[in-house]
Amino acid sequence: MLSSILPVDSFSVVALIATFLLVSLGLHFSFGLLNIVNLVHGEFILIGAYTAFQIQDWYGSSLLGMLLAPVVAALCGAFAELILIRRLYMRPLDTLLVTFGLSLVIRQGIQLIYTANPKQVVDPIAKSIMFVGFNVPLWRLVIVVIAIALVVLWLVINQTALGIRWRAVVANPELAEAMGINSNHVRTSLFAAGCGIAGLAGALLAPINTLSPQFGLRFLINSFLVVILGKPGSIKGMLVASCVLGGSLGVLQFHISTVYAQMIVLLLAIIATRLRPLLKKA
């Protein structure tokens, strides 16, 4: 059997790469495109996860909760952009402070409502298949497919009139305004889209993780690592960074503890970030 030949569960590595891609795609909109140091990104992942849990609690359907999670997160994101962030573009230190404060408010609010006790979102499929000798939960396969679909969807939208308007505002807001594009509306839609994707990521990842008010923090650092290493604003760079970081972490976890594996991945990301300018000069 291939499981006796392969040193690691190859599909688990692929699933981890998809997880890195999924949680960082929302940050690609706010940090990569809008240049917002978005420390509340993890809490929008949290909002999506708890939306799925709450809908499951009310109606007994985690799948319905997953469908509504990105809508709720996007609406919360649009509200946050309108009230707090809109006046802080081009002021990165101020956005850092505001998003950090908002993350604390959301996290503590969720803890007050749901307590710190762990919650669980039910796997809507709860089945598995054999893949090269390994038992693969079908829900992880769903996560991989959705992550790929979101990237393809973004690449397609990027070539439409809507995508051109978005890129125009990101590149030169003043010129875009002169051409009749409402930059405020575009920024709100971009930020809301990023929050919606973060909420979807949280809802999709909730069934394979224990849910708590600290849930979003698990993904915040890795999201920033992927976007920064892949070059902010570059979807292709983000794909490569997800493969490198997620793949490295997935392989290392089979040989050493997760804590040490994460430390090594962080060190690799720092080294790669430092070497990139030198490689460009060469």
Regions found by a protein language model. Give the residues of each.
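Inter-helical junctions in multi-pass inner-membrane proteins, predominant
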Residues: 2-13, 157, 161-163, 188-230, ...
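Single transmembrane alpha-helix segments in multi-pass membrane proteins
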Residues: 5-54, 83-90, 94, 229-232
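Alpha-helical transmembrane segments within multi-pass membrane transporters and channels
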Residues: 27, 60-102, 109, 240-245
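Membrane-interfacial amphipathic/re-entrant helices at transmembrane-helix boundaries
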Residues: 1-22, 51, 59-65, 91-96, ...
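Helix-loop-helix "hairpin" substructures at the membrane interface of multi-pass membrane proteins
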Residues: 16, 132-211, 235-240
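Transmembrane helix-bundle core of multi-pass membrane transporters
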Residues: 83, 87-159, 186-189, 256
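Pore- or pathway-lining transmembrane helices of multi-pass membrane proteins that form conduits
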Residues: 43-47, 88-111, 216-228, 256-273
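Cytosolic-side transmembrane-helix boundaries in multi-pass membrane proteins
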Residues: 5, 90, 94, 113, ...
